[in-house]
């Protein structure tokens, strides 16, 4: 069976912002494809800088075989601290597809990745652990033909709050869409 991986991303700038606060980076190694989504705190230029730094650091470190512990520690020490909020903050989701057979998902503070299997949203096991004071969610999923993963920042579930949707766009609605 010949299996291939298709990856696409779409980002929308927040209203009246020149840059998007979300960044996606794709890194290829000899045995894996690594997709990284990051959302920087705030919006516009500041958020873009934070998310770009996060994806670049994670991409470089993971490509070089570093552990997720080392990655999280490096991000915590590297991101510039916001003068207003006094924190350095960026969310991330990593999807590492190894040999087109296994997906490893590592998530920090983004909405959980949606797995569509045979056109239906399905649950998958998630293990939680704390690294450098941050709760990291990890999953390892054996792949099946035509599996679809949907990773998103909090911009998706928060879309339309108070306008089209009173309470935002629910995860199950996003999966159905």
Task: Name each model-derived stretch.
Residues 1-18:
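Regulatory cytosolic signal-relay segments
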